[in-house]
Regions:
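Glycine-centered tight beta-turn/hairpin loop motif at sheet-sheet or coil-to-beta transitions
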Residues: 82-86, 190
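Membrane-proximal interfacial segments on either side of biological membranes
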Residues: 1-77, 90-190
Length: 190
């Protein structure tokens, strides 16, 4: 248990993660401190009962390689989960840990550049929207640590989104704050 994830997410995960890390810290006589962290792990012993594409049986190897590079005010966290899933993110260090921007790409060969604007971009494989909606209605976004801040703009792209017995192709969903609430824009090929 991490204590960082909402209960609905943490309850869907079980297992342990062996890992190896390297930390390098620079404390110059003049100038700012900096650090680099490399973490290698294997999620082989972890099972996930979350909806696809993050479902996983224990026993399936899933290597994770993460690199962190930062200073006293921010850090970048980038790496891979498996051979084809890559993440790149920038975090700000203040009174609260703030995810400034991030991009997750599946079926990719390398880490993508960070988005130009604050927000999160999720480039996912085909998804079952009903399963994900049920997860979020069950509290998956509740009880996020009060010590963390996440971007209000989220973009989700998927080649196929299935929901309510229908399939939509090349879907892009953008959620952002609007007057009086959250505004969601959807675009697709159909």
């Amino acid at each position: 248990r991490t204590g960082l994830l909402p209960k609905a997410l943490e309850g869907a995960l079980s297992g342990s993660v062996p890992w190896d890390g390297k930390v390098a810290i620079e404390l110059p006589y003049r100038g700012s401190a900096s650090y680099k962290v490399d973490v290698n792990a294997d999620l082989k012993n972890v099972s996930s009962h979350l909806p696809a594409p993050v479902d996983k049986q224990a026993g399936e190897p899933l290597p994770v390689n993460i690199k962190v590079d930062g200073g006293l005010s921010s850090f970048t966290l980038a790496g891979s989960v498996g051979a084809k899933n890559h993440i790149n993110s920038r975090w700000l260090l203040g009174h609260k840990l703030t995810l400034d921007r991030a991009i997750l790409t599946t079926d990719s060969k390398a880490v993508s550049p960070l988005p130009e604007q604050p927000g999160v971009e999720l480039n996912m494989p085909p998804m079952d929207g009903a399963q994900w909606l049920a997860l979020f209605q069950g509290g998956a976004a509740n009880d996020v640590s009060s010590n963390m801040v996440f971007p209000e703009q989220v973009t989700l792209r998927t080649p196929v989104l299935t929901m309510a017995g229908q399939s939509w192709n090349n879907v892009s969903l953008v959620s952002q704050p609007g007057a009086g609430g959250t505004k969601i824009e959807a675009q697709g090929r159909e």
